[in-house]
């Protein structure tokens, strides 16, 4: 049985063009993968606190075991909706808690949901995939910075990195 969970999500309706879940349903959970169980990160769009509680409960199976995590990266060095210069993200980067939290993005849609860095780091395999020269340069210099992506690169010997222009 295959269970799929998102590492992060924009706090938007699942039918929104901004929804990661919508993209996963359309592009991944089909053909041979159509029987996979996809756990949503947006269950209660009208109440963010209740939503976090619901997602924490439904993600307990991933907290126990995650086999594979795919991360992306933004031009600003953010990953998994953990952003530089965001108070909630800073708290997450300084925390050892395992769980699901809210953060704020610098651009719309602002409200995000993410798994903590410790939650992500527990994964058996972590792959970082990104495109573009600007992101490559951010990653290349990440060992000298305090960007969110820096933590994962410095602290995960099992991370595999794939890049294309």
Task: Please report, for each region that a protein language model flagged, where it lies by residue.
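Short acidic/polar capping segments at secondary-structure boundaries
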Residues: 11, 45-48, 73-78, 84, ...
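Short hydrophobic/charged patches on amphipathic alpha-helices used for structural packing
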Residues: 60, 117-118
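Short, glycine/charged-enriched secondary-structure capping and boundary segments
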Residues: 19-21, 80-88, 141-145
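Class I SAM-dependent methyltransferase SAM-binding "motif I" and its flanking Rossmann-like core
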Residues: 71, 75-117
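ATP/nucleoside-binding phosphotransfer catalytic cores, i.e., glycine-rich phosphate-binding loops
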Residues: 118, 122-165
